[in-house]
């Protein structure tokens, strides 16, 4: 029997160098960018209620999330959860490297850097209590595609991986679908028998169909066992009702959202430099496609135009599958991670199909005469530089968001200290007194001071001034960060008080009349005095 060291040495001989590069580059770049957040306890508004949460989200269709998040315990411990999340993401980088057949270590580093720097990861870090589970879901989604590509019956194992991925977080279904589409496109581009290509395409389709059927079956069984139904949260109760008018009614929203987020979402690019980098990457991709089209005489084939049309019509839908699954969803940035694949695909496509004849020319004239080699070289260089610029820009954006999240915490802490002092100093207060409170911080008394809105506007959970939106947020913050246990009334009870004359006439905190006791209940008014 081999010793542990001998086993490790034997395993090490099986690991490809580019896998090590992908894994280590993801970890190193990830720690350099995200360590400030992972070493801090800076929750967002959802994090306040998730200091300990078993992640049993079966009613949201996430039947595997409780297991996926269980490795790090159910406590919100950013450093441990963050490390596990980065390890799973590094695994995704390795799978992508093998899936895309990346050999060039520079390209491997660029792909890994884009994956770990993209602001959707920072947005997920803001919801750190689910970070490790979500990154495991992404790993499984990517692995499902690789299994189909590598093995004849890999679509079966891939279907299982896809089912568990969707059972952890439905948003990463788009991640798998886009990768499948790209693999099919590469299949069509490269040499081979059409019958063989068709069989491989069918395997990708089978993986998706079987995987989703398995997901629904497991979900139905677990809901029945637990005696629960799908919740209305994020429109999940309508999941699967996409036939007929339901699907057609969402098509417009899908295309509008795709175009608006891509062009004006302030995430893919948010300044001149990142805008130019995305433009350069797009131009490199287009030029490479045009060269391949001319060289392969694709422009003479009707199938070429059919494929282009299908891609133009299908990719926005594939990217926004969450809008079909949950049409009423609040589309958080952490649900938009799949957009990074377009950047990764551009880098891969250029390096794969433009870099095969890379030669060096003596001068510009020779470069013009020898378009084959030098154009390839310029395309590879331009795409690489653009990717580096984007990685750096995303790193800056991530840390701007982290800085604002920390300031949100500090502002919330200062606000709650003042409010708690007022509550405890109000005549009639005693420990356990029922407190009636809406929770929103009024902008009349506390004007917005967030200066990062231009960059964090679409990063839900990391933008704004305060962590407080509901009475439950106040209760959790004061309990976990101020050590105060307060008895807030349920929202249903608060509804009647909110419309009472006594409450309407109160000042907004920190007004003199913003906290008082009425009939044994403490009224606390924090929202604007004047209602719209």
What name fits each language-model region?
Residues 211-242:
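Aromatic-rich transmembrane-lumenal/periplasmic boundary elements in polytopic membrane proteins
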Residues 2-59, 63, 69-91, 99-112, ...:
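Intrinsically disordered, polar/acidic, low-complexity terminal segments
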Residues 37-44, 117-127, 188, 216-225, ...:
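Juxtamembrane "helix-exit" motif on the non-cytosolic side of transmembrane helices
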Residues 58, 62, 85-88, 106-149, ...:
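Membrane-interface micro-motifs in multi-pass membrane enzymes
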Residues 175-209:
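Perimembrane helix-loop-helix junctions
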Residues 154-170, 175-181:
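Membrane-interface alpha helices of multi-pass inner-membrane proteins
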């Amino acid at each position: 029997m081999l010793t542990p060291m001998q086993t490790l040495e034997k395993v090490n001989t099986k690991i490809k160098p580019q896998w090590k590069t992908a894994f280590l580059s993801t970890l190193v770049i990830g720690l350099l960018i995200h360590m400030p957040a992972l070493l801090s306890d800076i929750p967002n508004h959802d994090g306040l209620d998730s200091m300990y949460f078993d992640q049993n989200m079966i009613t949201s269709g996430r039947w595997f999330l409780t297991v996926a998040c269980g490795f790090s315990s159910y406590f919100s411990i950013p450093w441990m959860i963050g490390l596990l999340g980065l390890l799973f993401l590094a695994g995704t980088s390795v799978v992508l490297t093998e899936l895309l057949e990346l050999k060039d270590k520079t390209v491997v580093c660029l792909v890994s850097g884009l994956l770990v720097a993209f602001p959707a990861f920072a947005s997920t870090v803001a919801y750190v209590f689910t970070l490790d589970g979500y990154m495991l879901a992404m790993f499984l989604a990517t692995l499902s595609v690789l299994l189909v590509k590598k093995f004849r019956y890999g679509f079966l194992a891939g279907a299982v991986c896809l089912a568990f991925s969707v059972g952890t977080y439905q948003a990463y279904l788009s991640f798998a679908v886009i990768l499948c589409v790209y693999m099919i496109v590469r299949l069509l581009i490269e040499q081979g028998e059409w019958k063989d290509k068709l069989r491989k395409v069918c395997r990708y389709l089978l993986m998706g169909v079987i995987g989703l059927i398995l997901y629904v079956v497991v979900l139905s069984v677990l809901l029945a066992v637990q005696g629960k139904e799908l919740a209305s949260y994020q429109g999940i109760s309508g999941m699967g009702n996409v036939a007929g008018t339901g699907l057609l009614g969402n098509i417009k929203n899908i295309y509008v959202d795709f175009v608006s987020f891509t062009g004006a979402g302030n995430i893919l690019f948010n300044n001149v430099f990142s805008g130019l980098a995305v433009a350069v990457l797009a131009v490199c991709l287009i030029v490479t496609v045009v060269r391949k089209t001319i060289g392969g005489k694709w422009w003479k084939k009707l199938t070429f135009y059919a494929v282009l049309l299908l891609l133009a019509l299908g990719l926005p839908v594939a990217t926004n599958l969450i809008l079909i699954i949950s049409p009423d969803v609040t589309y958080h940035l952490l649900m938009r991670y799949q957009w990074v694949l377009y950047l990764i695909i551009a880098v891969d496509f250029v390096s794969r199909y433009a870099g095969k004849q890379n030669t060096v020319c003596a001068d510009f004239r020779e470069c013009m005469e020898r378009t084959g080699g030098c154009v390839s070289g310029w395309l590879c260089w331009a795409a690489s530089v653009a990717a580096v610029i984007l990685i750096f820009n995303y790193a800056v954006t991530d840390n701007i968001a982290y800085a604002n999240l920390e300031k949100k915490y500090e502002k919330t802490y200062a606000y709650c200290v003042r409010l708690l002092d007022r509550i405890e100093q109000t005549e009639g207060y005693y420990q356990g007194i029922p407190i009636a409170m809406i929770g929103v911080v009024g902008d009349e008394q506390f004007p917005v001071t967030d200066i990062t809105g231009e960059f964090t506007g679409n990063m839900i959970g990391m933008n704004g001034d305060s962590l407080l939106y509901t009475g439950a947020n106040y209760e959790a913050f004061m309990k976990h960060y101020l050590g105060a246990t307060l008895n807030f009334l349920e929202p249903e009870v608060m509804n009647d008080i909110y419309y009472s004359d006594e409450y309407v006439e109160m000042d907004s905190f920190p007004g003199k009349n913003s906290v008082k006791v009425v009939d044994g209940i403490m009224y606390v008014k924090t929202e604007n005095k004047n209602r719209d």
